A protein has these predicted regions:
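Conserved mixed alpha/beta core segments that line enzyme active sites in large multi-domain catalysts
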Residues: 1-181
Length: 181
């Protein structure tokens, strides 16, 4: 259907700004998941990375159905071993999470321990921020533009690895002129 649409509308394949990845099923239902922005999604500030995370599948974070943990990381200090790049951390209440069951998925209450514990370690937040920073640079090179990116990610509870589920250009602030501070 997509190929037919592009052909009918004379859209060359190089104009399509989407990629598709086939990967293993990530077991974030027994890990955590969330979103990350390479610019502040509220202000457009482009020197920080904002990560939202919660336990279970990422659906509740993406839809706003849960108050996630929020971590802000300074891009300028990501490579500086003498400086902590984490600017701020706010723990979310994370009252519920979505997990797999026999018939699909179900929403469960999180444990008190999960509510009061960040859903990633500081090292994992910094690792994820580094990945987001590299993805942003790749997108900027690809589009020859200073765009930010919006990503969805998941931590597999079995192998303890972070996977990027989706990455796309950020659409609210990236179209505006970027201000240097």
């Amino acid at each position: 259907r997509a190929i037919s649409y592009r052909h009918t509308n004379n859209i060359h394949f190089s104009q399509v700004k989407m990629s598709v990845t086939i990967q293993k099923m990530v077991r974030s239902d027994i890990g955590s998941a969330g979103v990350a922005f390479s610019i502040d999604p509220e202000t457009g500030y482009n020197k920080s990375i904002v990560i939202n995370s919660a336990y279970g599948l990422g659906e509740l974070v993406v839809s706003g159905g849960v108050k996630p943990d929020e971590i802000v990381v300074n891009k300028r200090t990501l490579d500086n071993k003498n400086c902590d790049p984490i600017l701020s951390k706010k723990i979310g209440d994370k009252k519920t999470k979505i997990v797999y069951d026999k018939s699909g998925t179900i929403e469960l209450e999180t444990s008190k321990d999960e509510e009061n514990t960040y859903s990633l370690s500081d090292d994992q937040y910094v690792y994820l921020a580094n990945v987001i920073d590299k993805l942003e640079k790749a997108y900027q090179e690809l589009f020859d533009s200073p765009i930010g990116i919006d990503t969805e990610w998941a931590l597999d509870g079995l192998d303890n690895k972070i996977y990027i589920i989706q990455a796309r250009p950020e659409t609210i602030h990236s179209n505006n002129e970027t201000l240097e501070v």
